[in-house]
Amino acid sequence: VAATLAVTLPLQAQEAELRQIMEQAKRACDQLGICVVGGHTEVSRAVHTPVITATAVGKREDFCEAQHGNPEELDLVLTKWIGLEATSLIAAEREKELAARYPLSLIRRAARFEVYLSVASEAAIARKSGVYAMHDVRNGGIFGALWELSRKLGVGLTVDLQKIPVKQETVEICEFYDLNPYELLSGGCLLIAASNGEKLVEELAACE
C-alpha cells in the first residue's frame, strides 16, 4: 500500500510547520502500514490553513459486504464523541480568545483531541463483526451523518439525543462561539448500523 501527499500551505507558513505535518503523516502511515512514495508542496494565498490531499493505492483482498437483514430492525452505534475534529481545530487556532474565559489546561486538552481522529481500528472491528452499514461522521456533523445514513437505508431513524456522546470541552467551545455541537465537523467518530448493537459495543470496548 502506498500514498502520495499534496500539501498546500498559506504564504506565512514556516518550514517547521511543514516538517511537523510530514512527521505526523509518517506516524499515521506507519501505523497503517502505508508507505509515502511522493507528493507535492506549495504555498498559496488561496488558503489560510494547511490543506493536505492524500491519494492512496493498495491491493484488493476482500470487500466488506453489508450484512443481510431488515434495516428497520437495526441498532445505531456511535464511536468516540461528536465534534472532536472541530473542537481540536478551534482550540488550536483560537487559544487566545478562549483563554479569556477558560483555563489553558482545558483549551490545550481540547487541542489534543486530534489524536482521536482515526477511525481505522473501530472500522476494522465493525467489519469483522459484520455490520449493515458504516458512515464516517465528518462534514455536517452527526445530524448530517444521520440524514445520509437514513437515505442510504431508506428508512427513518429514531435517535435519543441525550445518548449521543460529547466531550465537555466541546460543549464549552460551542457555548463560547454559539455553535451547534450536533452540526460540528466530527472526524474520528464512526456511525454504524448493526443488527446487534450491544454485541458490537462490547467488542469495541474490549479493544480500547
Task: Please annotate each region the language model reported.
Residues 1-208:
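Helix-biased detector of long, well-ordered alpha-helical tracts
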